[in-house]
Curated annotation (Swiss-Prot):
Annotated NCBIfam families: apt (TIGR01090), PRK02304.1-1 (NF002632), PRK02304.1-3 (NF002634), PRK02304.1-5 (NF002636)
Gene that encodes it: apt
Keywords annotated in UniProt: Cytoplasm, Glycosyltransferase, Purine salvage, Transferase
Broad enzyme group: transferase
Organism: Shewanella halifaxensis (strain HAW-EB4)
Catalytic activities: AMP + diphosphate = 5-phospho-alpha-D-ribose 1-diphosphate + adenine
Gene Ontology biological process: adenine salvage; AMP salvage; purine ribonucleoside salvage
Pathway terms, separated by semicolons: Purine metabolism; AMP biosynthesis via salvage pathway; AMP from adenine: step 1/1
Designated name of the protein: Adenine phosphoribosyltransferase
EC number: 2.4.2.7
Lineage of the species this protein comes from: Bacteria, Pseudomonadati, Pseudomonadota, Gammaproteobacteria, Alteromonadales
Its job: Catalyzes a salvage reaction resulting in the formation of AMP, that is energically less costly than de novo synthesis.
Assembly behavior: Homodimer.
Amino acid sequence: MVMNTDSLALIKNSIKTIPNYPKEGILFRDVTSLLEDPQAYKLTIGLLVEHYKDQGFTKVVGTEARGFLFGAPLALELGIGFVPVRKPGKLPRETISESYELEYGHDVLEIHVDAINAEDKVLVIDDLLATGGTIEATVKLIRQLGGSVNDAAFVISLPDLGGEQRLEKMDLKLVSLCEFEGE
């Protein structure tokens, strides 16, 4: 994706790095600082809209919880529906679920069974790509419901953690606005 380097620098510079959070040795990339900057937030959504408009998407799927913060406004600007993928027990209608591995243990995600169908071309979005486990589980849910998903967008990517390679094995085209080294 070709984008204005000044715009990308503004977005990247709006993301604060918090050392030793949530544990010693981790550099936490705090996307909430981007949300506090209306210029950076608007620019982030605008760049994603510009990249994904006119590609025939029918739904944007965002992962809990920060994926909602970028997915919902993106879907609104694209004029398509937004579908949340959530942790168990948070969605009121019938759901399907997918378990996935974390660094220490596992987690589960759910989606409404009637949220996606075989006619849907889906764009998946989350705030950050690290190991790729959350998006891998999300893509599996969408495909179980018959939806077509070949694209995933992120505000931040941490390439050292291997998520890009993991998701490319699922035939996903990935777009990240900012990359940061390390964990």
